[in-house]
Curated annotation (Swiss-Prot):
One of its GO terms (cellular component) is proteasome core complex, beta-subunit complex. It comes from Streptomyces avermitilis (strain ATCC 31267 / DSM 46492 / JCM 5070 / NBRC 14893 / NCIMB 12804 / NRRL 8165 / MA-4680). The 20S proteasome core is composed of 14 alpha and 14 beta subunits that assemble into four stacked heptameric rings, resulting in a barrel-shaped structure. The two inner rings, each composed of seven catalytic beta subunits, are sandwiched by two outer rings, each composed of seven alpha subunits. The catalytic chamber with the active sites is on the inside of the barrel. Has a gated structure, the ends of the cylinder being occluded by the N-termini of the alpha-subunits. Is capped by the proteasome-associated ATPase, ARC. The gene is prcB2. The formation of the proteasomal ATPase ARC-20S proteasome complex, likely via the docking of the C-termini of ARC into the intersubunit pockets in the alpha-rings, may trigger opening of the gate for substrate entry. Interconversion between the open-gate and close-gate conformations leads to a dynamic regulation of the 20S proteasome proteolysis activity. GO terms for molecular function: threonine-type endopeptidase activity. Belongs to the peptidase T1B family. Residues 1-53 form a propeptide. This is Proteasome subunit beta 2.
Length: 281
């Protein structure tokens, strides 16, 4: 795409030549230097300090899936940002939540969104949910060199499978390894605490309202034990981002909806600081 086309007003030939339905393949052929996996960092001593996103959680319910994230980004032992957004729509029926190096993760999400949009425009149809999960896996794998230098991206992907008519969740490791999770999942620094909370609260017959309450309960428990995870911040009116994906598509809860659930949880926590108690039998 080096040819000067400004004088003629024409698009470069690369844009007019039939090719792959993958936007990443297009970039690899014509501008490979802008792909994340082709960037090389100079040798460094120690860990590179960069803002990191922390905890993402997801749970399924009959009819869909809920994906949510806290709002805190940390850099070492410092709170780098209190209102970062970590959950994004991938397309109409899927979403991705980011944990790991925030800047690289957001860039990866934007590239993923372009990948899905490009495929739909070229093929005239959307990728299956499995196909989307596989494309994201490839992107994560391409970031492995950066991950080895401490700049890992480990997202959580969730969506509504229009073929199977149910919500599904996919988790990843830094090498791009993909696993389908059943019922609930979490990633990030507070994931072990969030997962423990969801393990005790999850059940197969959750309503959408109960599922959104469950993920905020899990994020609250994660923030209670993990300093890198931010809980509901009533003073600053900062609440977790909660998204719901059903047969009607992607929907993000409004700040009013999220705050209403968070405030109800906080009110109950005044009586039970450790949260709801599961039955012993």
């Amino acid at each position: 795409m080096e040819a000067n086309t400004r004088s003629t007003g024409r698009l470069p030939a690369a844009f007019l030549t039939p090719g792959s339905s993958s936007f990443m393949d297009f970039l690899s052929e014509h501008q490979p230097e802008i792909l994340p996996g082709n960037r090389q960092l100079p040798p460094t001593q120690g860990v590179i300090e960069a803002p990191h996103g922390t905890t993402i959680v997801a749970t399924t319910f009959p009819g869909g899936v809920v994906l949510a994230g806290d709002r805190r980004a940390t850099m070492g032992n410092v709170i780098a940002q209190r209102d970062i957004e970590k959950v994004f729509p991938a397309d109409e029926y899927s979403a991705v939540g980011i944990a790991g190096t925030a800047g690289l993760a957001v860039e990866m999400v934007k590239l993923f969104q372009l990948e899905l949009e490009h495929f739909e425009k070229v093929e005239g149809a959307t990728l299956s949910l499995e196909g989307k999960a596989n494309r994201l896996s490839t992107m994560i794998r391409s970031n492995l060199a950066m991950a080895m230098q401490g700049l890992a991206v480990v997202p959580l992907f969730a969506g509504y499978d229009v073929d199977r008519e149910k919500g599904r969740i996919f988790s990843y490791d830094v090498t791009g390894g993909r696993s389908e999770e059943h019922g609930y999942a979490s990633t990030g620094s507070g994931s072990i605490f969030a997962r423990g909370a969801m393990k005790k609260l999850y059940r197969d017959d959750l309503t959408e309202q109960q599922a959104t309450t469950l993920v905020i309960q899990a994020l609250y428990d994660a923030a209670d034990d993990d300093s890198a995870t931010g809980g509901p911040d009533v003073a600053r009116r900062i609440y977790p981002i909660v998204t719901v994906i059903t047969e009607d598509g992607f929907r993000r809860l409004t700040d009013e909806e999220s705050s209403e659930i968070a405030r109800a949880i906080l009110e109950r926590r005044l009586e039970q600081p450790d949260g709801p108690r599961a039955a012993l039998l």
